[in-house]
Amino acid sequence: MSEPIKNRYEFTILFDVENGNPNGDPDAGNMPRVDPETGYGLVTDVCLKRKIRNCIETICEDKPGYRIYVKEGVPLQRSDKEALSYVGIDEKTDIKKMKKDDPELDRKICNFMCQNFFDIRTFGAVMTTFVKSALNCGQVRGPVQLGFARSIDPIMPQEITITRVAITTEKDAENKNTEIGRKYIIPYALYRADGYVSANLARKMTGFSEDDLQYLWKAIINMFEYDHSAARGNMAVRELIVFKHDSELGNAPAYKLFDTIHVQKKDDVIAPRNYTDYNVTVDESQIPEHVTCTRMI
């Protein structure tokens, strides 16, 4: 595995949805998430990281060091036990005595998890198995962090009634020929999410490398390509704008870089229904020295 990254990064993702639900809210009957005060749509960071994890699992299948820790149907404890077994810990082990004999025990377990699981190396993790076992390695801060995505304009979710010709039970079949269901869609929305990559945490904590970074960009660009569903409609990443600093700690505040990105609805558009209804520009004259900007799509 290559060396940890040496440069700080910030990045902005622009993605859109057409006739779909990008992130349902279980507290609101799976309606698309909305800021109730402004009407702007929201997509959680957890949702976006799930897409990235799924994409990495697809494109890096069976590649050493690129397993996924947080995945559907696999108890976290199962992966945790691999690390414990790696350092010789089982159910009969006196962990306190072992830690006294080996002061590096916590670090060895943490290194094992970071080296084997891409999402721990990238996003960090809280591994409760180790915490309960009195091991000081259960919380790992990841160098890559994402905020919530927010729509560029307020959204107008629609509840669509749908019918099904198949009947669930024999009793229902005696009285009706169809069943009715409902689903939520957004006719169109463009979302923006901002993210951060800390070279400092990569060096100190997880070893997130240049190879990992390239896989991260690839996964972000393709995170909806391998995850299509009728519920989500048509979703696509339209822009990935990356700011690279020439130092580990950075050369400019993140907000100044994000402020150089302008996404504006075209003057003659009332209700956007396509990505081409927006103008996306980067004011490169406002980007400080020692920071480079790359539009990866």
Model-derived features: where do they sit?
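RNA-binding basic/glycine-rich loop and surface signature characteristic of RAMP-family CRISPR effectors
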Residues: 1-297
